[in-house]
From Swiss-Prot:
<dbReference type="InterPro" id="IPR002310">
    <property type="entry name" value="Gly-tRNA_ligase_asu"/>
</dbReference>
<keyword id="KW-0030">Aminoacyl-tRNA synthetase</keyword>
<keyword id="KW-0436">Ligase</keyword>
<dbReference type="GO" id="GO:0005829">
    <property type="term" value="C:cytosol"/>
</dbReference>
<dbReference type="GO" id="GO:0005524">
    <property type="term" value="F:ATP binding"/>
</dbReference>
<dbReference type="Pfam" id="PF02091">
    <property type="entry name" value="tRNA-synt_2e"/>
</dbReference>
<comment type="subunit">
    <text>Tetramer of two alpha and two beta subunits.</text>
</comment>
<dbReference type="InterPro" id="IPR006194">
    <property type="entry name" value="Gly-tRNA-synth_heterodimer"/>
</dbReference>
<dbReference type="InterPro" id="IPR045864">
    <property type="entry name" value="aa-tRNA-synth_II/BPL/LPL"/>
</dbReference>
<dbReference type="GO" id="GO:0006426">
    <property type="term" value="P:glycyl-tRNA aminoacylation"/>
</dbReference>
<comment type="similarity">
    <text>Belongs to the class-II aminoacyl-tRNA synthetase family.</text>
</comment>
<keyword id="KW-0648">Protein biosynthesis</keyword>
<protein>
    <recommendedName>
        <fullName>Glycine--tRNA ligase alpha subunit</fullName>
        <ecNumber>6.1.1.14</ecNumber>
    </recommendedName>
</protein>
<keyword id="KW-0963">Cytoplasm</keyword>
<dbReference type="GO" id="GO:0004820">
    <property type="term" value="F:glycine-tRNA ligase activity"/>
</dbReference>
<keyword id="KW-0547">Nucleotide-binding</keyword>
<keyword id="KW-0067">ATP-binding</keyword>
Length: 315
């Protein structure tokens, strides 16, 4: 199965089971959890079933395109099921069959591994999924997002597409994976991404302007506050956010951008251990403010995705 067909198969599998198939977020994210289709929609009582591919960028993980399985950009396939169904594990195993891997013929293990994202103030009870000694997925029950309890709990499935493709094609290097094969015309993963890995690794480790990134982080932080406290001074005593006026989605966009600026600075070695914790705390505070405002906003709107009776019960 090619990399391209792997994505198409998972999309069809989850679409057939009631998931919306949405598109990747159009900003740099470290994981699919940063996509607002996860971070925001996992909050509050409204049901939400969605699946999407998320190109994920982690600047410090770059290896100039020389490491066979470690990159600064990779792809996750993320599924959010809210509320989490009782048979979520069975659905996951069924999805493995859809991509040509019968769990009965392989050593599939769920190894306890609770998940946490300090910058997002998020955590969940979870398991790594290993097949024949290789980790291919993460399975999580979200407990908190932005420091807010998740009620109901969402089930998250995250497929590591590169690892799965290497496993299915029996390749030792991600760059040898067949991305597409149409009538014998083969395009490999490395044909598309290997040069990009070298360029972005060079940028992240050597060329990123440190002063500009520090300044941009401050701008992002200020924008989040301005967009949430729209029409009020966030520094004023007693200032409060009006959820109906707040621009939650643009504010969250700047949270994501601030997190990426921090990650680039971290890759450049520009942040000390002490500063690192302080910056994580700053991003987490922004994420929490956005999450709280989003929850208040959805309530003020009457929970549009709930039926009328459910909305009244949730109030």
């Amino acid at each position: 199965m090619t990399f391209q067909d792997l994505i198409l198969t998972l999309q069809k599998f989850w679409a057939d089971r009631g998931c919306l198939i949405v598109q990747p977020y159009n900003s740099e994210v470290g994981a699919g959890t940063f996509n607002p289709a996860t971070f925001l929609r996992a909050l509050g009582p409204e049901p939400w079933n969605v699946a999407f591919v998320e190109p994920s960028r982690r600047p410090a993980d770059g290896r100039y395109g020389e490491n066979p399985n470690r990159m600064q950009q990779f792809h996750q396939f993320q599924v959010i099921l809210k509320p989490s169904p009782i048979d979520i594990q069975d659905l996951y195993l069924e999805s493995l069959r859809a991509i040509g891997t019968n769990p009965l013929d392989h050593d599939v293990r769920f190894l306890e591994d609770d998940w946490e994202s300090p910058t997002l103030g998020a955590w969940g009870l979870g398991w790594q999924v290993w097949i024949d000694g290789l980790e291919i997925s993460q399975f999580t029950y979200f407990q908190q997002i932005g420091g807010i309890d998740c009620r109901p709990v969402s089930g998250e499935l995250t497929y590591g597409l590169e690892r799965i493709a290497m496993y299915l094609q029996d390749k030792d290097s991600i760059y040898d994976v067949v991305y597409s094969d149409r009538g014998g015309k083969i395009v490999r993963y490395g044909d598309i991404y290997q040069r990009a890995e070298w360029e972005w690794s060079t940028y992240n480790f050597e060329e990123a302007d440190i002063a500009e990134h520090f300044a941009a982080f401050d701008v992002c932080e200020a924008e989040v506050k301005r967009l949430l406290y729209r029409g009020a001074d966030p520094a004023a005593k007693g200032a409060a956010i009006d959820p109906k006026k707040a621009l939650v989605l643009p504010a969250y966009d700047f949270v994501v951008k601030a997190a990426h600026r921090f990650n680039v600075l971290d890759a450049r070695g520009a942040i000390s251990v002490t500063e690192r914790q302080r910056f994580i705390g700053r991003v987490r505070a922004l994420a929490r403010a956005v999450a709280e405002t989003y929850v208040a906003q959805r309530e003020a709107l009457g929970y549009p995705l709930l039926g009328e009776q459910q909305a009244k019960a949730a109030e």
